[in-house]
């Protein structure tokens, strides 16, 4: 049987909208994951059953078994001793929803992907990219269980290292999809100063570093201490004796709540300054309306995010405000990806043609 011929304009639009939907689902997944963490729900399911775990407990006996499993881990005895079954159900549903959404994303990616390939809609370069993204998605599921497993034995919470890895990998997949969607757009290439391309790339890299630091803050609950601003521990820059009291010194960068919060603050200031300079440079360089708009939107989002971060800290991490802070972080990342891709697209005409899009 011969496959039907599909018009290029139509099939590229279909692929783009599918990828946009996948990016939105991943953003939702990150927010649900954030709510799961903030409600202390992440360890409520102590088993990893990729297929049979799709169904929640359906009887009183099954609920009792799930609750008994939770009672065996340190978090229950040290943090939630005396919790009722109804209280357990609340945290269970958060974690179950998070895992179910992950399974749904996997299916929502794989089935259309296979269909698009069967219809011959995907050029070879695009297929390779999408297979890599799918592989990263599978890895993300394994990393999620690796993270949960860290809190089932001696710890009462998951490892902050694994939490940060889980978050950054999710947002790396999200960014790869956003970048790919951009590369499927038919746009004229831009001639922009090299320094704008460099600063956009630096901003994107530092946003990922900041996301990692933010996950460390969350994992260590470092946002619930040193709740003053602009000072921290009584001064703008704490003493080195307080910042680096653990040995070896580099462990403080990941384990010391003061150091982790301090580096998160300093990275925020750095990002804000570079974003402002990038916007000014785009305007002065007359880099084009799209580049200027992108730079201004990015600077505005950075300003909003910094403000939300300060408010979240001063109010000791209320759940709603913390989730808004996390949501705006995704917006900042999206704008950083779009701006970097926009400025680097001038050197990527061949890549866009390899994806089946003619560059103007």
From Swiss-Prot:
GO MF annotation: an example: metal ion binding
Pathway: Porphyrin-containing compound metabolism; heme A biosynthesis; heme A from heme O: step 1/1
Keywords: Cell membrane, Heme biosynthesis, Iron, Membrane, Metal-binding, Oxidoreductase, Transmembrane, Transmembrane helix
Transmembrane intervals: 14-34, 104-124, 130-150, 161-181, 200-220, 272-292, 294-314, 317-337
InterPro entries the UniProt entry points to: COX15/CtaA_fam, HemeA_Synthase_type2
Subcellular location: Cell membrane
Catalytic activity: Fe(II)-heme o + 2 A + H2O = Fe(II)-heme a + 2 AH2
Any Pfam family: COX15-CtaA
Single GO BP term: heme A biosynthetic process
Topological type in the membrane: Multi-pass membrane protein
Enzyme Commission (EC) number: 1.17.99.9
One term under GO cellular component: plasma membrane
Binding site for heme: 264, 325
Co-factor requirement: heme b
Biological role stated in the UniProt entry: Catalyzes the conversion of heme O to heme A by two successive hydroxylations of the methyl group at C8. The first hydroxylation forms heme I, the second hydroxylation results in an unstable dihydroxymethyl group, which spontaneously dehydrates, resulting in the formyl group of heme A.
Subunit text: Interacts with CtaB.
Family: Belongs to the COX15/CtaA family. Type 2 subfamily.
HAMAP family linked: HemeA_synth_type2
Protein name: Heme A synthase
Organism: Nitrobacter hamburgensis (strain DSM 10229 / NCIMB 13809 / X14)
UniProt lineage: Bacteria, Pseudomonadati, Pseudomonadota, Alphaproteobacteria, Hyphomicrobiales
């Amino acid at each position: 049987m011969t496959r039907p011929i599909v018009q290029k304009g139509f099939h590229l639009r279909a692929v783009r909208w599918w990828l946009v939907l996948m990016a939105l689902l991943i953003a939702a997944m990150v927010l649900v994951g954030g709510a799961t963490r903030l409600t202390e729900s992440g360890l409520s399911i102590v088993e990893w059953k990729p297929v049979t775990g799709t169904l929640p407990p359906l009887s009183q006996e099954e609920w009792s078994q799930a609750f008994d499993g939770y009672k065996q881990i340190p978090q229950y005895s040290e943090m939630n001793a005396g919790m009722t079954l109804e209280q357990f159900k609340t945290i269970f549903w958060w974690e179950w929803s998070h895992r179910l959404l992950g399974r749904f994303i996997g299916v929502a990616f794989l089935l259309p992907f296979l269909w698009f390939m069967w219809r011959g809609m995907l050029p070879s370069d695009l297929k390779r990219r999408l297979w890599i993204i799918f592989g990263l998605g599978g890895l993300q599921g394994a990393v999620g269980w690796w993270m949960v497993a860290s809190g089932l034995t001696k710890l009462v919470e998951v490892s902050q290292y694994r939490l940060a890895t889980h978050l950054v990998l999710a947002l790396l997949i999200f960014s790869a999809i956003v970048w790919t969607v951009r590369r499927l757009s038919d746009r004229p290439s831009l001639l922009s100063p090299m320094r704008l391309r460099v600063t956009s790339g630096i901003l994107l890299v530092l946003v990922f570093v900041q996301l990692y630091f933010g996950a460390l803050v969350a994992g260590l609950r470092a946002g619930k201490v040193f709740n003053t601003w602009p000072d921290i521990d009584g001064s703008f820059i704490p003493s080195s004796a307080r910042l680096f009291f653990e040995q070896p010194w580099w462990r403080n960068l990941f384990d010391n709540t003061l150091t982790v919060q301090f580096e998160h603050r300093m990275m925020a200031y750095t990002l804000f300054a570079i974003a402002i300079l990038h916007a000014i440079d785009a305007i002065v360089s007359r880099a084009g309306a799209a580049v200027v708009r992108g730079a201004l939107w990015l600077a505005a989002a950075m300003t909003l995010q910094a403000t939300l971060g300060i408010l979240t800290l001063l109010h000791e991490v209320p759940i709603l405000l913390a989730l808004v802070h996390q949501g705006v972080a995704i917006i900042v990342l999206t704008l950083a990806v779009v701006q970097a891709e926009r400025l680097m697209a001038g050197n990527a005409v061949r890549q866009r043609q390899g994806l089946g899009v003619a560059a103007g």
